[in-house]
Amino acid sequence: MKNHIIISLLFLLVGCSKTPTDLDTLNKRGDTYYKVNSEEPFSGSVINKYESGQNQMKGSLENGKDDGLVTIWYENGQMVIKGTYKDGKKDGLQIQWWDNGQKMYEGIDKDRKLDGLWTFWYENGQKLKEETYKDGELISKKEWNEDGSVKE
């Protein structure tokens, strides 16, 4: 009896998990994605792939707009961008990488405004600059040369 309940729960959980929808199968009007032949904005997990089959983008939409974690990859499988969105706007941690795998930048966005510490790197991995923002306004900045020495 116990095994029967466990197996039933497993089938229920598997049945509830949805395969992400291919982004190319949705219609985009303005900045909102819709189901085909529908006026209803799409909500759910989405994915887009390169012709090679490699993931290009994974994310989720709520009422047709980016909502939650969005991840984008180069065709070679290296991550390009990882960031969070709310109602189609960047909201939370944003990270981007150079195509060689080195970080390009990392920081927090709040309603499309930079907030807190943002760090930027040269393609060689050396720190380029640190900027501190409050509500999108630059508060302080420190810069480095590509060799690691502080810029004057």
What residue ranges belong to the model's regions?
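Sec-dependent N-terminal signal peptides
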Residues: 4-13
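Glycine/tyrosine- and acidic-biased, solvent-exposed loop/turn segments at the edges of beta-strands
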Residues: 14-152
